[in-house]
């Protein structure tokens, strides 16, 4: 909406100015304005542009539950025993455009809170893996799960199986989108 209003009303705001205003609406807004592949840090407002992600089919499934982001962050216990994804290695994987390395190195520490409270999320992840995903992970604080696939046909079969399973109320099949406008 901010991008559109900037165009419609010929405000002349730069992308950076739009991003500064957007973060006041929500942490994800600057990412949507920036477009493309990025490393998000902080609460998601600190963005570093990355090369485009390797194209692949993506299955998205949201169960019929809602998750309180506040609940997840209040119950997150960041101790020395917590395994964090290796961000530097993941960025290198993205630069190499190696889907299998990306899948092996991705992770979400918020799953340690959300999955025990909502086991259906683990069921959805397992279902995707059983149907050919190279990996599946919860998005953000949940409850939505995405799975990366290396073949379109496998992703289509997984999509149909997920819809038939009843695990998710909303199921979408898409692909990585790399339109990073200047």
Residue ranges and their predicted role:
Residues 13-24, 106, 156-160:
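Short, well-structured alpha-helical segments that form the helix of a local strand-helix-strand
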Residues 1-17, 31:
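DPxDG-like acidic metal-binding loop motif
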Residues 1-8, 139-149:
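Short, small-residue alpha-helix embedded
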Residues 1, 5, 22, 121-124, ...:
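Hydrophobic packing within well-folded, soluble alpha/beta domains
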């Amino acid at each position: 909406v901010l991008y559109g209003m900037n165009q419609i009303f010929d405000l002349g705001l730069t992308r950076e100015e739009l991003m500064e205003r957007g973060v006041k609406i929500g942490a994800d807004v600057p990412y949507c304005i920036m477009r493309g592949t990025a490393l998000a840090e902080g609460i998601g407002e600190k963005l570093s542009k990355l090369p485009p992600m390797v194209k692949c089919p993506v299955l998205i499934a949201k169960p019929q539950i809602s998750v309180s982001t506040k609940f997840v962050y209040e119950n997150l216990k960041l101790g020395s025993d917590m395994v964090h994804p290796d961000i530097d290695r993941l960025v290198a994987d993205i630069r190499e455009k190696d889907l299998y390395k990306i899948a092996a190195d991705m992770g979400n520490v918020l799953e340690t809170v959300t999955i025990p409270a909502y086991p259906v999320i683990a069921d959805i992840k397992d279902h995707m893996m059983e149907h050919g995903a190279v990996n599946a992970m919860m998005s953000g604080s949940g409850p939505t799960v995405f799975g990366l696939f290396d073949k379109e046909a496998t992703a289509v079969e997984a999509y149909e199986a997920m819809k038939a399973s009843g695990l998710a109320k909303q199921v979408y099949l898409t692909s990585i989108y790399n339109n990073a406008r200047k």
